[in-house]
Amino acid sequence: MGITRRLFMPLVAVMVICCHDCGAQDFLFKVMAVHGRVEVKGLDGAVMPAKVGFSLQEGMTLITSENSYVALLYKTGNVMEVKGRANHLVRDLVEKLPQAKTGVTTRLVNFAISRINEVNEDPETNYKENLRAAAGVERALNGEIKVLLKYQDKSNIFYENQVMIEWLPEEKADSYEVVITDVFSEELYKTTTTNSFQIIDLEQAGIADIRMFLVKVISNTGISSRLFRLERSDDDSINEQILVDHTGKSAGEEVMLALFFEERGLYVDALKYYQQAAQISPDVNIYSVLKDHFITTQELGN
């Protein structure tokens, strides 16, 4: 059995709390993600599958099997990941958690309920295939790579120094150049990758002090994207609202951050954390579904 704990600030803490059995006030945990065989022994002794959004109460038992995974959100803001075969009394899981801070915002709760419900209502929707189809249309109509950012008169506001640029891959391309310029078209940074995304550390690139810049992606086959404008957020209070202990090792933790940034319109930061969640736990389908749903819902690339 392996258990990982992380402490979140209150604004992030309640994102998935109300997505199932919202009327129940005595739950201790909500199920965020499940992989493999995970069951719950209820208060009446009945055993049922653990599903995303399920409420865990004090008298229940969480039953995990070999190679299983479940991410749990405690009602006051802690995220716990449980792995391996064991029976866990819910009350004992609570005792393993550090003290969490309290306080919620109605806006964020409503946003979280809406997001989780949208994904759960139509789980068969293949967001990734829809995105690929959209990329084909983009290429056919405009001869362009589809970068997952906002275009036209909208800036892509970001907060953190590590920025992820992602695009939908070209069928015949083997590599891509990511080029950053200033508003006068002077090149500030360039890198080459064989992936369909690139995380750029602005400090290491020497451009952390530049508040606004332009980015484009060029394939080795000569196909280019549009120019996209990125601009740093001037909200210095964000760091105080995020989380206390972020190690980048917990997929549940990354999703919480993604939702936190998405709710604030910081889509560049949100996309990075959705991507990292999917990479940390590639076998847990809901993390990649949440990422693709986010891209589709926020119309990134348009």
PLM feature spans:
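Glycine- and acidic-residue-biased ligand/ion/polar-headgroup-sensing regions
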Residues: 25-45, 64-70, 75-78, 84-86, ...
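Compositionally biased low-complexity segments at domain edges in trafficked proteins
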Residues: 99-118, 241-274
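Short, compositionally biased P/S/T/A/G/V-rich stretches that sit at domain boundaries
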Residues: 113-163, 238-246
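Conserved aromatic anchor
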Residues: 164-172
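Short beta-strand segments within Ig-like beta-sandwich modules, predominantly Fibronectin type-III
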Residues: 189-195
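Surface-exposed, short loops/turns at beta-strand junctions within beta-sandwich domains
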Residues: 203-211
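Structural register within alpha-helical repeat arrays
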Residues: 257, 290-291
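Alpha-helical linker/edge segments of TPR/alpha-solenoid repeat scaffolds
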Residues: 294-302
